[in-house]
Swiss-Prot record:
This is KAT8 regulatory NSL complex subunit 2. One of its GO terms (cellular component) is cytosol. Non-catalytic component of the NSL histone acetyltransferase complex, a multiprotein complex that mediates histone H4 acetylation at 'Lys-5'- and 'Lys-8' (H4K5ac and H4K8ac) at transcription start sites and promotes transcription initiation. Required for NSL complex stability and for transcription of intraciliary transport genes in both ciliated and non-ciliated cells by regulating histone H4 acetylation at 'Lys-5'- and 'Lys-12' (H4K5ac and H4K12ac). This is necessary for cilium assembly in ciliated cells and for organization of the microtubule cytoskeleton in non-ciliated cells. It comes from Rattus norvegicus (Rat). There is a cross-link at residue 78 (Glycyl lysine isopeptide (Lys-Gly) (interchain with G-Cter in SUMO2)). Residues 308-364 are annotated as: Required for interaction with other NSL complex members. It holds the Pfam family zf-C3Hc3H. It is found in: Nucleus; Mitochondrion. Keywords: Chromatin regulator, Isopeptide bond, Mitochondrion, Nucleus, Phosphoprotein, Ubl conjugation.
Length: 488
């Protein structure tokens, strides 16, 4: 079977034909912030930002403010001439209005005679009284009046163009609300007083600025003078300002004048005291509230009372108590009372430190000793020193006479009953003893007897030596010398 293919073409029946939308204008291509203003035709920026494009046929408005000297930032079309003047739309409109007003002022209204002359052609004359000459002159006059037009006016000069009123508020585009009576030149009493007050305030501020400038110049010149004077003193010394020694007559005269000039500006006595008080008052008046607050703060005293008498000390900064009574303030946390010791309590205020229990310098606890001294060796009991009466002094050991000395094994002094070894100072170092004699002396029995003259004798060995006599201890005689006592 043959198949028949039928192609059905689509139709637009029953469908809504879409209405072509008008292409929306593109927005401005300003890069610093998004701008929703439409672009100018053939440009990429709006009228406000068209100056970003250097190739655009626009330039900055040529209007310059008379108040602050700033130029209008709006865009204006470039003129045909390179150095031509071009204004934005707002300033062009204001320029046209000002020019129109200027033309009205320069062209006064028609005078009465001119109006009567123009209306005389419509006046009716009496019948029969008009002559051909008069009718001919009347016709020529009407033709002359008809030929008279505004084109015969004088051209506008440069002086008649609008330059801008310095007192107007037309400098800013946003100044829409203007006072229509601002330039009237007629003021009420209140307005005159207000204007004069503003001018006086302005004049006062200018005087203050000028005074500050003069003060600055004075300080600068004084600083230079002191610097030059210091350099002069370092270079030449102070002899030129103290005495006329070594100076010529002319130099002495100049020195005298210099001293007079130095004393001329100085104040003495009551004048100096009054000048000082005046200077302090001026400082208090000029420094303002800060200086007054400082003086008020310095006059505050402590609020504590001791025996019903108020404390006369000045209070600490930002507090109402002095350093002695600061602990009475329950709100402060910078001071604590010293705990002292158990026997003697101490309530002296101490600044809070890193330690847990701050103490005053009198009750400060020292840390334990880090250095331990070395232990001293103890002396044995057998080597303890004997009584000082058993030893001879340096004066007693001086030899006065040469007497024989007898050595014995034992020394027995009658009266003391205490054995004492022989002193090595009584032996002659030139004496040499054999070993057996030393042993006999150390071990054998013997006695050393002291005679009445103070010499010692030895029993077994008869060795004669010179010795110093013992000092005799006893009662003093009349001449101050001790009386000798015999020792048997």
């Amino acid at each position: 079977m043959n198949r028949i293919r039928i192609h059905v073409l689509p139709t637009n029946r029953g469908r809504i034909t879409p209405v072509p939308r008008s292409q929306e204008p593109l927005s401005c291509s300003f890069t610093h912030r998004p701008c929703s203003q439409p672009r100018l035709e053939g440009q990429e920026f709006c009228l406000k930002h068209i100056l970003e494009d250097k190739n655009a046929p626009f330039k900055q408005c040529s209007y310059i403010s008379t108040k602050n000297g700033k130029r209008c930032p709006s865009a204006a079309p470039k003129p045909e001439k390179k150095d031509g003047v071009s204004f934005c739309a707002e300033h062009a409109r204001r320029n046209a209005l000002a020019l129109h007003a200027q033309m009205k002022k320069s062209n006064p209204g028609p005078m009465g005679e001119t109006l009567l002359c123009q209306l005389s052609s419509y006046a009716k004359t009496e019948l029969g009284s008009q002559t051909p000459e008069s009718s001919r002159s009347e016709a020529s006059r009407i033709l002359d009046e008809d030929s008279w037009s505004d084109g015969d006016q004088e051209p506008i000069t440069v002086d008649q163009t609008w330059r801008g009123d310095p007192d107007s508020e037309a400098d800013s585009i946003d100044s829409d609300q203007e006072d229509p009576l601002k330039h009237a030149g007629v003021y009420t009493a209140e307005e005159v007083a207000l204007i004069m007050r503003e001018k006086l305030i302005r004049l006062q501020s200018l005087y203050i600025d000028q005074f500050k400038r003069l003060q600055h110049l004075l300080k600068e010149k004084k600083r230079r003078y002191l610097h030059n004077r210091k350099v002069e003193h370092e270079a030449l010394g102070s002899s030129l300002l103290t005495g006329p020694e070594g100076l010529l007559a002319k130099e002495r005269e100049n020195l005298k004048r210099l001293k007079c000039l130095r004393r001329y500006r100085q104040r003495y006595g009551v004048e100096a005291l009054l000048h000082r008080q005046l200077k302090e008052r001026r400082m208090l008046a000029t420094e303002g509230a800060a200086q007054q607050a400082h003086t008020t703060r310095s006059s505050q005293r402590c609020l504590a009372f001791v025996d019903d008498v108020r404390c006369s000390n000045q209070s600490l900064p930002m507090t109402r108590h002095c350093l002695t009574h600061i602990c009475q303030d329950t709100n402060q946390v910078l001071f604590k009372c010293c705990q002292g010791s158990e026997e003697v309590p101490c309530n002296k205020p101490v600044p809070v430190s890193l330690s847990e229990d701050p103490c005053c310098p009198l009750h400060f606890q020292l840390p334990p000793q880090m250095y331990k001294p070395e232990q001293v060796l103890s002396v044995p009991d057998g080597l303890e020193a004997g009584p000082m009466d058993l030893y001879l002094s340096a004066a007693e050991l001086q030899p006065t006479e040469s007497l024989p000395l007898e050595l014995s094994d034992d020394l027995d002094v009658v009266g003391d009953g205490m054995p004492c070894p022989p002193s090595p100072l009584l032996f002659d170092p030139s004496l040499t003893l054999e070993d057996h004699s030393v042993t006999e002396i150390a071990g054998g029995p013997g006695q050393i007897q002291v005679a009445g003259d103070g010499c010692r004798s030895q029993g077994p060995h008869n060795v004669e030596k010179t010795c110093a006599p013992f000092p005799q201890r006893g009662l003093a005689t009349a001449n101050g010398k001790p009386e000798p006592t015999s020792i048997s």
